[in-house]
Amino acid sequence: MTLAEFWPLCLRRLHDMLPQGQFAQWIAPLTVGEEGGVWVVYGKNQFACNMLKSQFAGKIEAVREELAAGRSAFVFKPGEGVRYEMAAVEGAVEPAEPSLHAGSEEMPVQEVLLDELPSEEPVKPAASKTAADILAERMKNLPHEPRHTAEPASRPESEVLAKARTDAQRDAEEARYEQTNLSPDYTFDTLVEGKGNRLAAAAAQAIAESPGQSYNPFFLYGSTGLGKTHLVQAVGNELLKNRPDAKVRYMHSDDYIRSFMKAVRNNTYDVFKQQYKQYDLLIIDDIQFIKGKDRTMEEFFYLYNHFHNEKKQLILTCDVLPAKIEGMDDRLKSRFSWGLTLELEPPELEMRIAILQKKAEAAGISIEDEAALFIANLIRSNVRELEGAFNRVGASSRFMNRPVIDIDLARTALQDIIAEKHKVITADIIIDAVAKYYRIKISDVLGKKRTRNIARPRQVAMSLTKELTTLSLPSIGDSFGGRDHTTVMHGIRAVAKLREEDPELAQDYEKLLILIQN
């Protein structure tokens, strides 16, 4: 199937599955093309590409897999290509006269990543119009509602007004993204709270209300995919909602490094310093990547001191505690701990279920409790994987015209993940992981010692073996030094009770589940 045959059909599918406003605003105007054999969806700018990839790529790919499975995945990049009209009915492929735009010379395909920044240029000064300025300017020029009946027009005046307001809001949103690099999707309203992030969320909201005061810097650490980026960007979006004139910037540490090296190379160091010092809130993701770069660390040390002395807010994320960042300047390690340092924990079962329910609500899909529980038990490691699993199930729900996600649909959509989770886990793997986690010997786990520091990890390992393998109780007993099945049963029951009563053991158990499954 050619792109000219596929895209009109894809438009028809997307039109049928998306709300009318979303389709008209984001999908209908798209142009597409082919570069080096790769199908490309063009957005008018970086903001549009990021929005398309985060919100609609899954749906587009689901259609491609159904109708053109032999083709590689689409890439998303800024530019202009050919616009096709939507197929009138399924199978009717009537592309409109191609609208070839200037600059048809083939460009190398560059895939747009979700966390990619708009450009590698130094951070732009905030002297340009703010999002609020643009919105106010556009709204001021809108036509007023007529007091009397106007002459017949091709569209009602109210529709013109509504479209103009929508365009103004979208332009203002794009302007905000260009200035701040904040995603409009990452807000406190869209954040699901649970035990793993509740304290961090409360601190983040306090910072948004009074930046630069008590919690400065705010250092957030944890494994990949736990929601650090969502939480820190929510601070920026909330601050701008309360103070539209605030100067905010979110960036990845790689982009800070690139902009600094470019300033050194171009002898624009003074401009670089002023660009960063202007912000009221600076958010840097994955700060650990500046380690080992002496000049960059030295410059960031001075920038840090400026923010602290001027009571401007600095928010940093990392994968480990500040003290554990090997190769980081000791002065920076010390300063990273001056404010508030918090860890994001993997989401517990209740939080994972709540995330799935919120995703379903946002997508206009109903999910049965049994299906949500199944998916939440299958994906334990992080929020990103959980959302990815839901997107797959949601796509299956739409294409199969099943408005309710039940457990059978979830199993069918995620069957490859189910197979992957269970195909390599053995009792030996679990015993080894538990021994390393509790820093005891494997021989102790299998032996006869009954001291608490040995017996409890042994019971945890038995319980994990029961949950993650298909072994019977007698077989589990054999794997643990030839123990009787009643001993295994007693250990499993003891761990189940302790998980309800002892938060520390419950947390250890969840961490081991994630460690073993990944």
From Swiss-Prot:
Protein name as annotated: Chromosomal replication initiator protein DnaA
Claim: Nucleotide-binding is one of the keywords in the record: yes
Region (Domain IV, binds dsDNA): 398-518
Organism: Neisseria meningitidis serogroup C / serotype 2a (strain ATCC 700532 / DSM 15464 / FAM18)
Gene Ontology biological process: DNA replication initiation; regulation of DNA replication
Subcellular location: Cytoplasm
Summary of subunit composition and partner proteins: Oligomerizes as a right-handed, spiral filament on DNA at oriC.
Protein family (similarity comment): Belongs to the DnaA family.
Chain positions covered by the region annotation Domain I, interacts with DnaA modulators: 1-72
Region (Domain II): 72-180
GO-annotated molecular function: ATP binding; ATP hydrolysis activity; DNA replication origin binding; lipid binding
Domain notes: Domain I is involved in oligomerization and binding regulators, domain II is flexibile and of varying length in different bacteria, domain III forms the AAA+ region, while domain IV binds dsDNA.
Gene name linked to the record: dnaA
SUPFAM superfamilies (UniProt xref): P-loop containing nucleoside triphosphate hydrolases, TrpR-like
PANTHER family: CHROMOSOMAL REPLICATION INITIATOR PROTEIN DNAA
Major location (coarse): cytoplasm
CC annotations in GO: cytoplasm; plasma membrane
Binding site for ATP: 225, 227-229
